[in-house]
A protein has these predicted regions:
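Bacterial N-terminal signal peptides that target proteins for export
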Residues: 3-18
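N-terminal "domain-start" segment that seeds a small globular fold
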Residues: 36-80, 106, 110
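Structural micro-motif
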Residues: 157-161, 176-186
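Thiol-/selenol-based redox modules, centered on thioredoxin-like
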Residues: 181-224
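C-terminal motif of bacterial Sec signal peptides marking the signal peptidase cleavage site
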Residues: 26-28
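Structural microenvironment flanking redox-active thiols in thiol-disulfide oxidoreductases
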Residues: 100-156, 168-172
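Short active-site neighborhood of thiol/selenol oxidoreductases, capturing the structured segment around
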Residues: 79-109
Length: 224
């Protein structure tokens, strides 16, 4: 009888200890979740939506073709260099303003994923990353890393140029400065004419990839 009582007491003790361990583990899991401060980093493509139905809302921008940007190798690139045989989708991100913008990396990820569809429509893409000074050039690497993570499937390169607008010269020429830059999208035809210009008022205020493809389809359907 004593042995039976002793065994029962031992079992209850082990069960109690197990319950304490499980409770501690669960509490640890709860604490390991993201804090409110980290929540912005968790915004993913599925959580971000851009506009399918948009109309041009901005002036074409004087001298847009001859704006000069710099790629990661230090080579100067102008929009003029990319037209002629192709249309051009020119996209301005917000740039580096103390953090990597999740909306910008998500949008650029969408351009990477849908680049084949854009290319099939006879078009090239140029993404501009504005920075205030040359010392911030390394932030482009951080931006691209965030973009590749969102793209998934082992993506490590972009199929189109991503360039720096050092000193916000292009941003100021187009009148799109706000903090750094307002989100802006320009579509140029093969002749260099701006056929669509959209400047957003917030980070999510951009034409969706669907809207861009629709604009490119319009160009493709034109005679000549």
């Amino acid at each position: 009888m004593f042995n039976a009582i002793s065994k029962a007491s031992s079992i209850r003790s082990r069960l109690g200890a197990t319950s304490v361990i499980v409770a501690a583990l669960l509490a640890g899991c709860a604490r390991s979740g993201p804090s409110v401060a980290d929540s912005a980093d968790l915004i993913g493509p599925a959580d971000i939506h851009f506009k399918d139905d948009v109309t041009a809302n901005a002036a074409p921008g004087d001298g847009l073709l001859d704006l000069s940007f710099v790629d990661q190798a230090g080579k100067a690139i102008k929009p003029r260099d990319l037209i002629g045989k192709k249309n051009l989708v020119l996209v301005f991100t917000r740039g580096y303003n103390g953090s990597i913008c999740p909306y910008c990396s998500s949008y650029t990820s969408g351009l990477i994923t849908n680049y084949p569809a854009i290319s099939q429509r006879g078009s090239e893409v140029l993404v501009v990353y504005p920075i205030t000074k040359p010392d911030h050039a390394q932030r482009l690497d951080e931006f691209l890393k965030a973009t590749f993570i969102r793209s998934g499937d082992g993506v490590t390169t972009t199929p189109f140029p991503v360039v720096l607008d050092i000193g916000l010269k292009g941003v100021d020429a187009l009148g799109i400065r706000k903090d750094l830059a307002k989100p802006a999208t320009y579509i140029l035809d093969k002749g260099g004419r701006v056929r669509f210009a959209y400047v957003g008022n917030s980070l999510s205020d951009r034409p969706s990839i669907k809207a861009i493809l629709k604009q490119l389809d319009t160009l493709r359907e034109e005679p000549g």
